[in-house]
């Protein structure tokens, strides 16, 4: 882009652009927002608008693209969703009042993580900005949703921070400059990151910002004073808000600690494989989709967080259950609350807009409607007699004074923009009423003048009109221009008519136009005074929004339970999971009409049945059974009713899944490496209160490697002295059925099938005992495999089975392992073979507890070389 002698406008543009080189600059010129240079090229492509050129000095030009200023709300979201930071540069003075270049400046910097624009935000999700501060072994992290005022912090291991990033899904992450590689190594490349200077991430700078914002002497009142790394991350967020011109943030009233010990640990693999809030394909259905019957945006956002952060304490779970139970017993109350919740709207985000000074007149009216609806909700809660609902009712505040003031001062159906006028109600301000009388009676006055002049001049076609060039005028056709009085002043000659002005019209014009300007200024002032008064009500209205969200979530649970025939589970501190007639909440909703879901029982405890090995053919329903057990457990621990005939859930502290293939090929990891990494994470972090799901572990390697690893992992879980994790282990390795004989808390089950001739019918029923057949060839046939391949597969299978029987392979080595199992040792390492003896010694000397996944893989390769001699 050539640049020699710039025009004053372009010089002003480049000066402002230099301060925000990493943002697309929307530069206000008259009624348009314009982009220049590279911004124009990028913006035109994203927005699908025409790219053109603007003159920039003699013989120079610059690329340009733009759109009308009133279309900002349509185009801005497209830029932000494309991952762009957008600097909005407005005219800071009225062009009519200056003969020089209009002053311009940045009024807002919108980024993916910092926005209050409704067209950018998803009302069902939070829009979090995150900040991370790295130390040697741990990190501090902070999350802020400027659209709701929620501000949270935590610190912990890389693994814990990764879990939080996955669950909160921030739209933007702030990091120290130069830490991009470290961040991506720890958390992957999936986040939009922005680098800030190192000095911003210092203790003193961060504490100063936080104390200044909250106007406190220390942070003890927030319970975060010991989270030094979290405080640094939080301070960086406040700095970033200041840099992006978001300085009015009185709605950020607290910094809360994310309490790790309150919630069940769900890693990103578990959240993804259980499809809790999202699906693996566009056509899928998540758990959230099934149980989300919320009405308010606050309820939708809260339910999403409840699902991702199940509770570990029995008491708050039971309190939620009691409310859901109450709604079942009192359908009239449920109906009343439903009706009132529909009136609430996005109370949380509206009051945040009040704080930042971006609330519209219509949103203020919606605020009034919401506060009016809170009164009957409060009364219903207080009258319920249910302790949790009564506590909610006590805290709800209808804010009657400000509600009544809005009712009195704002028209019921105002325009969305202040500058459109017609906002302030009649009778609020005497001066405003007088000005309106002048401005709005103008039409009648002009009609009277027009009729009078027709009668005086005898010109029947005479008419009075207005344009922006010379204001009010009288138009007379040429056939009557000889009748025009001498005191009329001619202003314009048309083909068929002449236009005139009079002193009377000019005086009236000044009066009426002056009145309109004064009306707009006065309405704007009165509206801003009301908004300022509203800022005093931010804390109670934020509390209302939170409580409404809670009621909405619990109502949603009741509606989902009623619609889907869920029951109330017993939740306790026991060590058992006892599910009778359990169903998969998502799959049962996808079955064809009239087809029943085959329910199954699952029982796990620490004494008799800690581990269930599930065998059965592919497509029989093993994976669904694993997932439904985890989902029922999770639903119980968020206070929801569950799809079962009965359920007793002993609290779990962590849910682990190794379900399905999840190759991370993009970073060079194979299926097997991913399996081993995930399995290692489970084995190193499980406790006696954990629920562990393994589905087809070992598929990424050879059969005997797979069997060996699967056996060793199951044995390790069974024999671990301090972590008897309740485990469901689905496998196609039927050899693992032998483990039941050697380990008292391992039990075999299979998902039953029925053979009819050459066909297989999947019964999908879990029954005791192992399965000896995989029916893989039957599944291939069902999948439409060519008949010749199916036939040849059967021939090869029979040949292999015959050879194995002749050589005595089938079952014998595995049974030998089971019968001689001792401690952690696998019995086939006790055979009289010098090579296997060497392997046994290698494994004996391993420090399993301190072995990293990579070291384990290298050791496996070394053992393979010993066995194969290669």
Curated annotation (Swiss-Prot):
Signal peptide: none annotated. The keyword Acyltransferase does not apply. Keywords: ATP-binding, DNA damage, DNA repair, DNA-binding, Nucleotide-binding. InterPro entries: DNA_mismatch_repair_MutS (IPR005748), DNA_mismatch_repair_MutS-lik_N (IPR007695), DNA_mismatch_repair_MutS/MSH (IPR017261), DNA_mismatch_repair_MutS_C (IPR000432), DNA_mismatch_repair_MutS_clamp (IPR007861), DNA_mismatch_repair_MutS_core (IPR007696), DNA_mismatch_repair_MutS_N (IPR016151), DNA_mismatch_repair_MutS_sf (IPR036187). PROSITE patterns: DNA_MISMATCH_REPAIR_2. Belongs to the DNA mismatch repair MutS family. This protein is involved in the repair of mismatches in DNA. It is possible that it carries out the mismatch recognition step. This protein has a weak ATPase activity. This is DNA mismatch repair protein MutS. It comes from Parabacteroides distasonis (strain ATCC 8503 / DSM 20701 / CIP 104284 / JCM 5825 / NCTC 11152). The gene is mutS.
């Amino acid at each position: 882009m050539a640049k020699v002698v710039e025009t004053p406008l372009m010089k002003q543009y480049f000066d402002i652009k230099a301060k925000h080189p990493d943002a697309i600059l929307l530069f206000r010129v008259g009624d348009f927002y314009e982009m220049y240079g590279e911004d124009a090229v990028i913006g035109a492509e994203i927005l699908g608008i025409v790219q053109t050129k603007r003159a920039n000095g003699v013989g120079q030009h610059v690329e340009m693209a733009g759109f009308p200023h009133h279309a900002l709300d349509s185009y801005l979201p497209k830029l932000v969703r494309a991952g762009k930071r957008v600097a909005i540069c407005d005219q800071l003075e009225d062009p009519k009042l200056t003969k020089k270049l209009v002053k311009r400046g940045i009024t807002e910097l919108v980024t993916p993580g910092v926005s209050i624009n409704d067209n950018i935000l998803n009302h069902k999700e939070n829009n979090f900005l995150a900040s991370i501060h790295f130390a040697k072994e741990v990190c501090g992290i902070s999350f802020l949703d400027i659209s709701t005022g929620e501000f949270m912090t935590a610190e912990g291991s890389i693994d814990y921070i990764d879990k939080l990033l996955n669950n909160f899904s921030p739209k933007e992450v702030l990091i120290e400059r130069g830490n991009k590689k470290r961040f991506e190594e720890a958390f992957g490349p999936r986040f939009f990151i922005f680098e800030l200077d190192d000095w911003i991430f210092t203790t003193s700078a961060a504490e100063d910002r936080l104390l200044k914002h909250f106007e406190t002497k220390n942070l003890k009142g927030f319970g975060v004073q010991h989270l030094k790394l979290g405080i640094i991350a939080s301070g960086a967020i406040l700095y970033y808000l200041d840099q992006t011109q978001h300085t009015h943030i009185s709605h950020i009233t607290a910094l809360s600690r994310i309490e790790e010990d309150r919630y069940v640990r769900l890693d990103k693999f578990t959240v993804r494989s259980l499809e809790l809030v999202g699906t693996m394909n566009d056509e899928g259905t998540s758990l959230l989709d099934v149980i989300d019957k919320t009405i308010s945006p606050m309820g939708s956002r809260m339910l999403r967080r409840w699902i991702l952060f199940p509770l570990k304490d029995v008491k708050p779970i039971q309190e939620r259950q009691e409310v859901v139970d109450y709604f079942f017993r009192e359908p009239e109350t449920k109906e009343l609350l439903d009706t009132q919740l529909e009136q609430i709207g996005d109370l949380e985000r509206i009051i945040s807009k009040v704080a930042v000074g971006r609330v519209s007149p219509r949103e203020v009216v919606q605020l009034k409607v919401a506060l009016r609806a809170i009164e009957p909700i409060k009364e219903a809660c207080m009258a319920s007699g249910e302790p949790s609902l009564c506590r909610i009712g006590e805290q709800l505040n209808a804010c009657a004074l400000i509600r009544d003031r809005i009712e009195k001062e704002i028209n019921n159906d105002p325009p969305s923009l202040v500058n459109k006028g017609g906002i302030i109600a009649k009778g609020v301000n005497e001066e405003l009423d007088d000005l309106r009388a002048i401005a709005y009676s103008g039409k009648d006055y002009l009609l009277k003048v027009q009729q009078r002049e027709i009668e005086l001049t005898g010109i029947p076609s005479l008419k009075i009109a207005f344009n922006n060039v010379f204001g009010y005028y009288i138009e007379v056709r040429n056939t009557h221009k000889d009748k025009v009085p001498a005191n009329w002043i001619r202003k314009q000659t048309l083909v068929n008519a002449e236009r005139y002005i009079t002193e009377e019209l000019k005086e009236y014009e000044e009066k009426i136009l002056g009145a309109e300007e004064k009306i707009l200024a006065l309405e704007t002032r009165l509206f801003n005074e009301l908004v300022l008064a509203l800022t005093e009500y931010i804390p109670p209205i934020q509390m209302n929004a939170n409580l409404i969200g809670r009621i909405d979530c619990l109502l949603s649970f009741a509606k989902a339970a009623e619609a889907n025939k869920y029951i109330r589970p017993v939740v306790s501190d026991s060590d058992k999971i006892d599910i009778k007639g359990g169903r998969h909440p998502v799959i049962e909703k996808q079955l064809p009409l009239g087809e029943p879901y085959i329910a199954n029982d699952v029982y796990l405890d620490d004494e008799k049945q800690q581990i269930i090995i599930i065998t059965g053919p592919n497509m029989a329903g093993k994976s669904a059974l694993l997932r439904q057990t985890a989902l029922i457990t999770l639903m119980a621990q968020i206070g929801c009713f569950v799809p079962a005939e009965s359920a007793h859930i002993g609290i779990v502290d962590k849910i682990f899944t190794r379900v399905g293939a999840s190759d991370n090929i993009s970073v060079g990891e194979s299926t097997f490496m991913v399996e081993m990494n995930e399995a290692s994470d489970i084995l190193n972090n499980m406790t006696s209160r954990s629920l562990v799901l393994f589905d087809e572990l070992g598929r990424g390697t050879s059969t005997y490697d797979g069997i060996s690893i699967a056996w060793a992992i199951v044995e390790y879980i069974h024999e671990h002295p301090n972590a008897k994790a309740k485990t469901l282990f689905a496998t196609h390795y039927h050899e693992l059925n032998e483990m039941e004989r050697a380990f008292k808390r391992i039990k075999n089950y299979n998902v039953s099938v029925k053979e009819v001739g050459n066909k297989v019918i999947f019964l999908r029923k879990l029954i005791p005992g192992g399965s000896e057949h995989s029916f893989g060839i039957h599944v291939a046939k069902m999948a439409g495999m060519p008949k010749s391949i199916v036939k040849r597969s059967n021939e090869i299978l029979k040949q292999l089975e015959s050879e194995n029987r002749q050589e005595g392979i089938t079952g014998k080595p595995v049974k030998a392992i089971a019968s001689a199992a001792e401690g952690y040792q696998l019995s086939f390492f006790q055979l009289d073979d010098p090579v296997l003896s060497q392997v046994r010694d290698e494994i004996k000397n391993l420090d399993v507890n301190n072995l990293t996944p990579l070291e384990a893989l290298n050791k496996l390769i070394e053992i393979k070389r010993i066995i194969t001699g290669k």
